[in-house]
Amino acid sequence: VHLTPEEKVAVTTLWGKVNVDEVGGEALGRLLVVYPWTQRFFESFGDLSNPDAVMGNPKVKAHGKKVLGAFSDGLNHLDNLKGTFAQLSELHCDKLHVDPENFKLLGNVLVCVLAHHFGKEFTPQVQAAYQKVVAGVANALAHKYH
């Protein structure tokens, strides 16, 4: 991902304020509610029958935290996202058979959740930087599919 020095500062400064537990669960939950076909990858998570069940599901929250933990790792290795996400790309491609388009959807949902949590602090410039990052992460996660 090619970020300007200002964009890197914007991304890392905001990320330092992110509650990974809360934002991760909300982002994954929203993905499952807004794009219900993604629920098929989470059938073992129990009740996903309605938005309240999804958003309150402890397994969704726990996995969302795990997802954002990996995203945090990516933010520490912006110059090597493909290497950072190589194993996760392989897992999602070969074993889980996740449609790589879902990585883009989750990235965009994450941007929405960050905007919701940070309001005016999530300026258009910050959003532009985050859109670059989530696109780069989605691309890295889709790498093994090519």
Curated annotation (Swiss-Prot):
Gene Ontology molecular function, alphabetical: haptoglobin binding; heme binding; hemoglobin alpha binding; metal ion binding; organic acid binding; oxygen binding; oxygen carrier activity; peroxidase activity
Pfam families: Globin
Residue numbers carrying N6-acetyllysine: K59, K82, K144
Sequence intervals crossing the membrane: none
Keywords linked to the UniProt accession: Acetylation, Heme, Iron, Metal-binding, Oxygen transport, Phosphoprotein, S-nitrosylation, Transport
Residues where Phosphoserine is found: S44
Any single GO BP term: hydrogen peroxide catabolic process
Domain of life: Eukaryota
Modified sites of kind S-nitrosocysteine: C93
Modified residues (Phosphothreonine): T12
Tissue expression as described in the entry: Red blood cells.
Binding site for heme b: H63, H92
InterPro entries named among the record's database cross-references: Globin, Globin-like_sf, Globin/Proto, Hemoglobin_b, Hemoglobin_oxygen_transport
Keyword Iron: yes
Annotated Gene Ontology cellular component terms: blood microparticle; haptoglobin-hemoglobin complex; hemoglobin complex
Domain Globin: 2-146
UniProt function note: Involved in oxygen transport from the lung to the various peripheral tissues.
Self-association state and partner proteins as the record states: Heterotetramer of two alpha chains and two beta chains.
Family, similarity comment: Belongs to the globin family.
Name listed for the protein in its UniProt record: Hemoglobin subunit beta
Organism of provenance: Cercocebus atys (Sooty mangabey)
Phylogenetic placement of the source organism: Eukaryota, Metazoa, Chordata, Craniata, Vertebrata
Gene that this sequence comes from: HBB
